[in-house]
Amino acid sequence: IWPESLSFSDRTGANGNATKDGKLSYVRIPGWHGRCVPGEGFTATDCNQKLIGAQFFNASWGGSAAVEAERPWEFMSARDYNGHGTHTSSTAGGNHGVVATGPAAVFGSISGMAPRARIAMYKALWSTEDASTASGFTGDLVAAIDQAVADGVDVINYSISGTLTNFADPAEISFLFAAAAGVFVSASAGKSAWRNLSSRL
């Protein structure tokens, strides 16, 4: 996640839109157990009352040294290399009224679906250098899911494709346990039509 994005600021200006130095507009959440783990390009102070947690998982890969040996461009932190985690987090829970930048600037201001939601990032995938894709190990994905539940999240947004072959893989089982703990799981189902079939809804 890119914590400097106004989508994740906990402050608002006089117009009610997110700013870096306005009035604090979020309060602490009772019962929250998450942490803000510092690392490369990410300090503990990058978290706030909107971005309330940031952790990264790579033990199944062999730890940070193993990831760095294979993907030296990556950030050994919750910082996003290819932008996917930032995009999906801001789409789900980014602040209201944030001025879009880059090619999206034509849209003016943007908002997440649940703009008052808090965000906790659990990074378990590591990007290719061209930022076209990312990969990781199932053990790290499961560790991230389980940690999110233990930390006290209400919703897990899992925007990492899907499976057509194995509905009982370890990540799916972790989602069942998350649901049993009262956590709503929103998981993508992939971006390709199954056997060239598509729905015409």
Description of each model-found segment:
Residues I145, F175, L197-S198:
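Generic hydrophobic/aromatic pocket-lining and core-packing "Φ" positions
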Residues G182-S186:
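Hydrophobic beta-strand scaffold residues
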Residues I1-F137, D151-D154, N166, A179-A180, ...:
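Subtilisin-like serine protease catalytic core
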Residues D10-A14, S174, A187:
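Conserved cytosolic headpiece of P-type ATPases
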Residues D140-G152:
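Short, well-structured alpha-helical segments in soluble
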Residues G190:
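Active-site glycine-centered loops adjacent to acidic/histidine catalytic or metal-binding residues
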Residues D169-E172:
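Charged helix-capping and loop-helix junction motifs
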